[in-house]
Amino acid sequence: MDVRCINWFESHGENRFLYLKSRCRNGETVFIRFPHYFYYVVTDEIYQSLSPPPFNARPLGKMRTIDIDETISYNLDIKDRKCSVADMWLIEEPKKRSIQNATMDEFLNISWFYISNGISPDGCYSLDEQYLTKINNGCYHCDDPRNCFAKKIPRFDIPRSYLFLDIECHFDKKFPSVFINPISHTSYCYIDLSGKRLLFTLINEEMLTEQEIQEAVDRGCLRIQSLMEMDYERELVLCSEIVLLRIAKQLLELTFDYVVTFNGHNFDLRYITNRLELLTGEKIIFRSPDKKEAVYLCIYERNQSSHKGVGGMANTTFHVNNNNGTIFFDLYSFIQKSEKLDSYKLDSISKNAFSCMGKVLNRGVREMTFIGDDTTDAKGKAAAFAKVLTTGNYVTVDEDIICKVIRKDIWENGFKVVLLCPTLPNDTYKLSFGKDDVDLAQMYKDYNLNIALDMARYCIHDACLCQYLWEYYGVETKTDAGASTYVLPQSMVFEYRASTVIKGPLLKLLLETKTILVRSETKQKFPYEGGKVFAPKQKMFSNNVLIFDYNSLYPNVCIFGNLSPETLVGVVVSTNRLEEEINNQLLLQKYPPPRYITVHCEPRLPNLISEIAIFDRSIEGTIPRLLRTFLAERARYKKMLKQATSSTEKAIYDSMQYTYKIVANSVYGLMGFRNSALYSYASAKSCTSIGRRMILYLESVLNGAELSNGMLRFANPLSNPFYMDDRDINPIVKTSLPIDYRFRFRSVYGDTDSVFTEIDSQDVDKSIEIAKELERLINNRVLFNNFKIEFEAVYKNLIMQSKKKYTTMKYSASSNSKSVPERINKGTSETRRDVSKFHKNMIKTYKTRLSEMLSEGRMNSNQVCIDILRSLETDLRSEFDSRSSPLELFMLSRMHHSNYKSADNPNMYLVTEYNKNNPETIELGERYYFAYICPANVPWTKKLVNIKTYETIIDRSFKLGSDQRIFYEVYFKRLTSEIVNLLDNKVLCISFFERMFGSKPTFYEA
């Protein structure tokens, strides 16, 4: 029997079992049940003394136990690390057992199961059926997984089944209550193992009149009275709410591979199950494959108060307790963890994921026709957009113009769509799927058959969006890759944090190397310095800036220095200069490079003046070995990414290589995380110290480098910053560039693993050509061992606001001067939620104007400053006098929480007062909108005081009175504060700011 593993799960009844859900080549699903064990590792001496004897025991052979406590010394008399070798046993017990001196107890039982039996969680196997006992059709028991799964076979493809769903609930306030608000619609996208896709929506007929029901039937809707009458081939079905809920129960109890929702764990599934129990007394029941255990669908919450989010709110995750092998997957929580977005609402996520450039085909009266294909955008973008368009009802044009779809024509690689849209002047526009221009509260207020049918279209679109997002993010691929890498069940891959997922590969490595790492002392945590961030040399750059990144800097630092708790020889500290000098002189004699590396770190305690960590590089440590595995996997996916042809493949492979990059980089974080199995304070501290020296080394050879006559003269000798080696340190290097090229280089900024190098040229093509040659020369001549850099991009018209804040036009390494550059806003107001649309629009306008001035090169920095400030004053005065912009441009949002130091915090007072006077109260954890409003007769106010008192909550019913105005000065001051930080002339900026607002501006730290 050939099977592919697709999920593992446990039953938690009186008799605990582990189950495998697998699929054969013919598409048949097979469940295999295994005994559940708790695992303990003990020495042979302890094993022999156990009474009663262990239930099962396996020899692990001779293993080396290493004490990884850090040795701190004031001289070079460092004691050798404690180390012993003994025969070890792995004990399996069906119930928890207290065993003295057991080791390796920090690892998960499920990881022990996989590794001890040689099973890959996502592997393909030819099962030896003599080790299988049939329980029922499609379910077997196995007591000997090692022999049963002994024959691993090449991976083969299998079909999967899915249920994507969404619901709509009636509400008269802001949020439905399960006790009073019925479900009006449930929509499903059902994909079975044959690949057949069914789309259907159930409409609650109890919210319609009998006349409307008859009209719906006349229009082609199916009306049913019971579950037995359901026809899943019909797109629209009318039924009572009880029938609607019983159909949901029937579908959810099926054993799909995946049931996928968007925030469904917290809302949709919870609402369905609670409403079902309320109206019928029935519950959704899951049964284990052996039919021995039944559990009710229940949503349980996991509150991680140690990981608090924005506003002090605890990070709460929601989980479905099922035992039938189905993976209930919540896209909302997955995307929150994997993407950094301004908003995690479904419309914002789909807008980010599904967009393409469309060409204007025709302009009509209040309508426009767009076409999209492989000629209007990158290959695959239009095809992905067209797929979503099949159920889409609204399209967002140019970021914020929401247009209703009138007609659409879709083919394999493109589309044509007619939109209800104001006439727009350009020939091409960005089209995306954002927010539908509908008000659900108003729709329920005016509810009738036509509205019910409209809502059915919105509901099925949201259900299908779950499928489109599932495919866009490559969740299935990531799940299988994660299961294999982390040695975890597919259902648990995204449940744990980095400190837990790392345990599987770590355990695997320790068993391969026959190593046990133990501590006898309490882990101590001290602060340490992070990565090096350079101060920007200036604000605006008319010349091009080349961006070079170290490839996986921290992982490669760990590999280079062999940083690991067991390779740490010791830490030498000094309390006075004489002691430090003596230690420094003797260190290199006793611990000579390259076998040893000595890392100078900042002292951990105030009474120390120096601290040096010493690592032995002769035998590769646990952490470097682990990192090599992750980096090899990342390299494999990067190679697949380069060979990929479609945008979908590229997205999946790019996300996979990025996942391995994140996992590899997380190892550094785990070295400094006290609760991690990899905790090693000296290693984490040494990692950042070496990283800082590497970025300073690269900056030192590039800052002042010159290119002429085909030769590149680096600014400093190419000396290894850690120890002398046999490399050629001559800074003059021959290039393959034309001999007439003459350019100078200047380092202008750097951050942790990247260096920004200005070249005295504005030619994009030449800059890219030179940067690629620089990349080759740096990797071949400047860097050493496993360190490599990569030329990432040319930044044109770079505007540096401060450290980690900049705006630029980015030309990637694979582009040329004819390519459309990407606008990058790093850490700036355009990417923040707590900034008004007015601010974002204005700052975008002024940055664009600055970029154009830099490109033209006709003005010096003083002239640019004068021109920008003069224009800004005109714009602000004009807006203040006309007061023409709508209120929505000035709205801000904030999360309501109670984690304030002061009990009378003005934010809390604002919401409390609002809730007293409004039936729709603002709940804890909810975002609300507010604006600064003042009396209309207040003149331009220079000095702003007590601005919190002008905050007004903006809800759906708010209208700006004739005696009120927007308190523009608050917004203008914030905008001007950001703009003056873009300009180089501080004197002019201060003078302007004082004249407009009566105070000096705050300049960002360099």
Curated annotation (Swiss-Prot):
Entry-linked InterPro entries: DNA-dir_DNA_pol_B, DNA-dir_DNA_pol_B_CS, DNA-dir_DNA_pol_B_exonuc, DNA-dir_DNA_pol_B_multi_dom, DNA-dir_DNA_pol_B_vir_insert, DNA/RNA_pol_sf, DNA_pol_palm_dom_sf, DNA_pol_type-B
Effect caused by changing G372D: In PAA-R, NG26 and PAArVg mutants; phosphonoacetate-resistant
UniProt entry tagged with the keyword Methyltransferase: no
Annotated GO MF terms: 3'-5' exonuclease activity; DNA binding; DNA-directed DNA polymerase activity; nucleotide binding
The entry's keywords: DNA recombination, DNA replication, DNA-binding, DNA-directed DNA polymerase, Early protein, Hydrolase, Multifunctional enzyme, Nucleotidyltransferase, Transferase, Viral DNA replication
SUPFAM superfamilies noted in UniProt: DNA/RNA polymerases, Ribonuclease H-like
Entries under Pfam families matching the protein: DNA_pol_B (PF00136), DNA_pol_B_3 (PF08408), DNA_pol_B_exo1 (PF03104), DNAP_B_exo_N (PF08452)
GO biological process: DNA recombination; DNA-templated DNA replication; viral DNA genome replication
Outcome recorded upon mutating S338F: In PAA-R mutant; phosphonoacetate-resistant
Induction: Expressed in the early phase of the viral replicative cycle.
Reaction catalysed by this enzyme: DNA(n) + a 2'-deoxyribonucleoside 5'-triphosphate = DNA(n+1) + diphosphate
SMART domains attached to this UniProt entry: POLBc
Mutagenesis / variant outcome for changing G392D: In NG26 mutant; temperature-sensitivity
EC number: 2.7.7.7, 3.1.11.-
Function: Catalyzes DNA synthesis. Acquires processivity by associating with a heterodimeric processivity factor comprised of the viral OPG148/A20 and OPG116/D4 proteins, thereby forming the DNA polymerase holoenzyme. Displays 3'- to 5' exonuclease activity. Might participate in viral DNA recombination. Does not perform OPG116/D4synthesis across an abasic site.
Family: Belongs to the DNA polymerase type-B family.
Subunit field text: Interacts with OPG148/A20. Component of the Uracil-DNA glycosylase(UDG)-OPG148/A20-polymerase complex; OPG148/A20 and OPG116/UDG form a heterodimeric processivity factor that associates with OPG071/E9 to form the processive polymerase holoenzyme.
Note: Ts42 is a temperature-sensitive mutant. PAArVg is a mutant resistant to the drug phosphonoacetic acid (PAA). NG26 is a double mutant with a temperature-sensitive lesion and a mutation rendering the virus resistant to PAA.
Protein name: DNA polymerase
Gene responsible for this protein: OPG071
